[in-house]
């Protein structure tokens, strides 16, 4: 496994610097094709939706199943930083912003343009991910809602 700080030749302390989500998107399309790009956009959108401000370079990785061709590793470190860091921003820049609440369809259109990505893949993946996350959350929130502190220890 090779995390993206290693891919870009950066020391771990630079995991929040030097590279943007736009750079990563272009690299993934180049190395992993449309399938890899679709998965990357899916994860990026999901992390924005759940408020994960910690998707830095060491939380994205490649695996090399044939020892030479990279594929995105399974997702890991998916969490919401929002409850712990109100107002938290993205770990890396997405087009010209780190503010999650500014990550609109227009930002993803700009991502497609800047990174030379197929816009239809970016936008359709974004739409599908938003809908799936909302649909699943309405079902799952009943199961995973935090208990009140009064009955948590009982």
Task: Go through the PLM ranges and name each one.
Residues 1-57, 61-154:
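Anionic ligand-binding catalytic core segments
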